[in-house]
Amino acid sequence: MYVNQIDDIIDGILNKLYFEGLSNDESFNSIVNSNKINFVEYREQINKFIDDFVKSIDLTEIRKIINNKDNLNRIIDIIKRYVAYYYFLSIAYNYTGSLKDFRNNMIQYSKLQESSTFIIRNFFDTENNYQLIKYFKIIKDTSKILLMTDLQRKTLNPLDVKDTIDFLNGLGKEYINNYLLMITVVDNEDTVNINPHNLIKTIVFGELYKNQERNLVFEILNEIEEDKEEYTYIDIVVSSDETNDLNNFRQIFLGEDDAEARARDLFELANETNRVTTIETVETKNNDLIALKIITPIVDDFLRYHRDTERLDAESGPVNIPIVSNNNSKNVQLALLYQQRKKKENTRAQLVINKLDAILDYYSPNVKNNPEFISEIKKYFQNPLSYRKAVLHNYLDEVNVIDKIRKQGKKAMENNEYFLELMQIITHAYFNFKDFKNFGTSINLFNTKPVNMLRYSNIEFQNQMSNLEVDVHTGIEGQSVNLVGLAIGPFNDEPVSCTKKSDLLDIRKIQITYMKNDQPVTRSTDNGYKAFLKIIKHFYINTLEIREEPEFSIYNNFDDIRKLNPDIFGKMIYWTYNTELDTFEMDTYENIKSNSVQDIIRFMNAMIYDKIMDFLDKKLVLLIETHTNLSLSKIESLIQIFSNMNQLSIDQEERRDLVISNFLQKKSQETTIVPKKNLEIIPLPEYQPLNLKKPFVIGISMINPLNPQPYIKLEAYSRTTKDRGIIQATHGKCKHESEWNEINKVKNQNLNKYNSLVTAFIEKYHLETTQLDYVCKVCGQILPLKRYVQDGSFNNNTQQFVTAYVPIDIPLEEIKEYRKYVLAIRYIDALINRVSLITNTNMLVGTNTNVRQRRKGLVKNIIDIILKHNSVNMRKNISDVERSEYLAKKYNINKDLNEVYFFELDDSIFNFTPTASNTEITLNKLKFNNILLYFILIFITELNGPQITMMATDKIAGNIYVFLKYGQKLFGDLLIKTNINSNETAPITQYPVLCYLLYLLSYYLVKYKLWYQPGENTKVYNPYYSKVIINSFVDLFNGISSDAGRITDDYVYKLTVSKMYTQLNTTYRNNEIINILRRNQSKYDTRSSGIDTTQVTTENEIPTYPIANPINIPVKPRAIPDFKKSSGIIFDREDKILYPIQLTNTDITNCPIGSYHAWVSDGHDIRCTICGEKGSEVTGSVIRLDANYYYSLNNIANRRCIRGTLHDFIDKNGKLVCSICGHTPNETYDKPDLDKLMDNINKIDDQNAENLLRNIHNQQIKYENQQKVVEDFIREIKTDYAKDSNNKLYGRLGPICDKLITIFETYLGSNVNLDIDKYPVYLRNNIYIIDHSYNGTPLDKPVIFSQNENRILFRENHQFFKTDVYYYTDNRLQIDVFYHAVTLKLLGYKEKHKEYTRVAKTNSYLKINYSIMERLLMLGYKTKYIDIEDNFVRNSSRIKDVNTNYFQIIDNLIKDHINKIKKIIDKFSSTIYKIKNYQNQLNEEQEPIYLQSSQDIDKLISKYFNIIKIFNIGEDDKAFDNWNYLRTNFEYQEINWLDTNVRPSENMYVNSELVNYYDISSSEMMYYLVDQLISIIDSNPEKITRSNLCQMMVEIIMYIYNIYNIDEYKNILEFKRFDYIINGSSVMVDMLRRGQGLEQSKELEQHLDDTEPDIMQDMDGEPQEADELEDLKEEAESLDIEGDYFAEEDEDYAQEDFIE
């Protein structure tokens, strides 16, 4: 007794119902023929028909199976249900109304049925109504889809027809063609239609019955069987192995959450070694076979070839091929194809498609059996390229046809039946035939690498054009090919494309010879399978050998093959399939005879692949075993190279086994050699001490080793052995080499210590040559110091050089000492970049290596001096009050204006978020101001005169004339130290350039709000803060100078003060710079005559006097301390002897030749070693100024020619001679020549000054022109923006984004899933995901709705839930389900005719996958609804007016959004430029980046670089080129909120749409962004490139959106709990730790907030203070979009909230 007996009975009943019942039912025919919408009115007639039909069923066969009355009634009820199903689905098939109409009818029918006497058990209820409505849609969709073309099906929305697609996929193509489609003859033409009976019966019987009642029928039959049969009980044997028993693992986790899942995971882990390895499918093996380098697949296709003169014959119709096949499936598809053709109009598009369809059928059985049609199709191939199987077409005509369709509009394109087919045709050149000429199989390629394929036309027409190279083309992933054979060769390593057609050999017509057991063997066969494997094995695999030179590699040694097969060696052997000749045996039993020819060929290819892999495995083992003399690393390289070369997948375990089993165990062990006795013993060598003899005299140049110079005498000795012929050379090293090696050991440990040691090394050993090289003072060897010297500075006070070396290739934050200051490094780097742009000192702006290195060195110096100076002063035992009093007294610093503060530097200083305490925020602001002071100190030391004169100015206060007018008031009587070794001070006004720099920088810091200004301040520039900065700077300057004088050996102080005082004594006191500034900025002079005198006092210039008339300056004698020699008694008093001061150069100071005396002791007198004069002979009355003057000029003349240029010494006859003037080194010149030299030097100086002024003027003009261009561009953007938005002030962001989305739709499709997320993502429609039922119970499979379905609705201020809600209606259960509109949490539900029900304690949420349009509008926001409750409560303590508080918060939200939009545009531009200029910088030695977001952006960049390697970035590649100039011009525009409709509400959330509406600046920036993106798309003419660019931009939008948005995480319970623990109060955290829920802890905390005042004070203060803090953060964080410190995309500080 079997269940299928009942199945056959039900199947027969349904057939009878269709053929005999419905056709005679008047009610059914009336509903169908009259297109009745309301079929409820036929309810009584339908009930009567079903009842009569069921009663008419013959139950005889059923009673034979079931003799129990109860069971019989149950079976009859089941039959009655499915008769009703069939009846109503038949109505559904013919129903002309909408789905909604059918649903309403079924619901009404079910309600009325409650009072009916006719009963069908379990039918007229909600569940069955849902099934009928579901299958109503499936029937309607099936009727459309099955009659569509493939390309028309691709235009369908997968979400709309998902159920139908699943239904059809479950049936399969063969079933659909054989049963659901049928061919009918209409007007003597074959027409394909839907078979309604089979379709409905498939649903009723196959979907409903088998999934519902069939199990019940089985149980009934099983009960009957059990009553009749007897049973035999058996014992079950259970394994004693605990690891194989899942129940043992279940016991471990008994009582725990997810016990079953955990037990299964542990069970699988324990039994992992017993898992069966995955077996490759036949399809995979076929792909892997043709991907092998040694094999070339042969494909049969035809080529469409363009010819300008080709024209379509409009009169000719399609070739109609009759249906003659015995295969119903093929007949249906063929008839359907012709039917689709006939639907098309007789247009040019139809002619193109009909022609192609006819050619595709060239090898179909219907054509082969009809010679007339063969000749018709052959006409298409009758052209000069017929030997290539090419048909001619006119590409330009086809493009014109497509353009005409496009011009009709988007809707016309979508409704056009052949538009997609045309697009498919013109974008491809090669097309597969639908059938095969002889033998072949179809393969879908899924290899990522392209495959070279040989066309079958080369073989088919080999005798035509045989001297040409073979025709090949490339197959790519996703392509389908008709594989008709395989080819191998040529064997001379030439590419396949270079093989001629005449060199093609049939594998069945050749003999091959190979070596077997050292004997030649010759074979030939008709079995291509066997011959192909023999060639692969003996020609390719057995010839693999190892080559160790010039590099380790594997190659094919074809020498023997070439000798044995001279006729085929350089040729290509092809094998075309023939299943009648190509027989093969399988290792396992497979009945493949019942398979089709295509399946047999696939099995055969899979066998070939297995055999080749087996050959390769054996060959690899043989290579390892025969090369045990190689090293282990070479064997590992061998395995790696072999596997890569032959595409072997060898895992790590298999490699290990290969090495152990076939190498280490086979490797012969070297035997120990034991010497025999009585052999001659060779004595060991004996050490003999060396005699130091034979001195050598060596001449060493102390200045320039390359040129002969007077030398000192050194003696060196060789060491000799007993053998006089063997001399052991000594390798002596200078001490500087060993010291240098020791210094380099510190290089990667402590950079500052390294620099300090290098500085000491330079001082100890270096000597500069005339060629500007650096040599050792001791040995004359060149020292590697140039890169250390070029970054350093010379300290005039200590007469020492101090290096400032910073390694180029290592980021500063990766150096050990600076790893904990990552954020500080980036903020200071951003600050340098920002201030450089503001002040127009562009030597520190840019991305080239030199600029980046210089900026990095500056950052390092700033951090070093901050750390050092703060550390030193924090250890001092002095209070701040005492220190202020001391500074005020000593340096006249106003202690009320001094903000110097000493602190420990750490990254928390830059924490300006509202979560920080008020005290912490205040301290951080003060610390940040102090960092600015250090920045000013280091920054101005990098400026030279020309850079100072070119600094930016403005007409308000930032110019020289305002400085000259008010400078005295700012600087007053402030004093600075003139050196570090004494307490000598000077008024700061003696250094006018320093004062100007301090004034200008303080002005810009205040103007751009980089300097924190507490309190309300509405002025653009407040001079008070300039005075604060200046007084604080003087404190810092003097403090560093004093501490450097005390700690003289500290490298950081030494480097800082050397730069400070070098600038102080040169640039800062240069009045000429002030004069140049006055000339350059004369436009700011408010008086017509200009300002004649400088109000800032300067030190008087030292007057000069001619040599002939010197001035006498009276100077008192000075005391020189002198100490007597003692006989043991210590004298504490010195003898005071007065010595007269020498006021001029006399015979006491200078020799007659003008040089200074070099006095040495000579008995009781002193003697000059240069001129020989004695101290007793000189009187001081002989003036030698003139001699000294010419002596100095003579020294200059030894470096420069008379004309003023440097000498160019060359070797001439053994002497150094200048090639310019002919003079030799150290030559003495006469006075006329020296006077002439001085005149020429003065001329050169004058010329240099003129060039400098000219360059300054040109740069000023360039800067002004650049500013004008920027202003014009901004004006143009604002004008275009206003024009596009019809001069609207607010609410302009939506149309801007819509413009970009429209462009995307053009190239990506309007309603297409972009497939970039786990849930669908569309351009315009949001997606709603529901993964739970109405009461919060999780669903196995989520339900997905699209926005355009209008299933998810929105309602404001719901009357029951008292908030805005989303809701949907579950028609199946008649339940409305409600969600909170802000949090998306499940609130409750309402059943029909019942009260509302709240769902408590649930973690169920509505998920929204926003569209690209919505994400574009939400860029920069954490969430769509912004929670402002905390900010509102905190502000309410000082802002009593509710409206003012609310409006201030919205203002801050807008400001924050403006800053984030700037950073978003930065990210857009930088990402696009990175893709354009992508370079893969990660090598094997570098550590990979583990941060997920960094991996995401790296993958995105790498992905689109590989997809679109070459593309244009706007016109002339200048998209975003001017963004850096525009960036700072977008600022918050004040809004009068009282003039708007915006008012605070009880709901403490602000919709991001409200912020967007009133955010004018962000709208303008988004307009700029969209304009640049569109320009990038338009600058690339190729459509495929535009499509790829659009897809790339979509993914960039997704990436940036995900950086800011937290919607994905905010409703995850674990994240919420973590957030509450981190940010909650102590009471709340304590409750959470004790196991309380989040809701209870929030309620208690809210209660505490209401009863106790909040101790957290607001960080903003007054409204203006918020603006300042906002700008401070913006300026501190803002970076150039190509800055080098933001290489890791995950570190985005824009995510930090900055809102009150």
From Swiss-Prot:
Q: Where is the composition biased (Acidic residues)?
A: 1651-1700
How does the entry describe its membrane topology?
A: Single-pass membrane protein
Would you tell me the Gene Ontology cellular component terms? host cell membrane; membrane; virion component
Disordered, as annotated region: 1650-1700
**Main localization of the protein?**
host cell
What are the record keywords, sorted? Coiled coil, Host membrane, Membrane, Transmembrane, Transmembrane helix, Virion
- Superkingdom assignment: Viruses
Using the record for this protein, list the coiled-coil segments as residue ranges, or answer none.
1246-1278, 1657-1684
Q: Give the subcellular location.
A: Host membrane; Virion
- Transmembrane listed as a keyword: yes
Membrane-traversing stretches: 986-1006
**Per its record, how is this protein called by name?**
Uncharacterized protein R472
The lineage is: Viruses, Varidnaviria, Bamfordvirae, Nucleocytoviricota, Megaviricetes
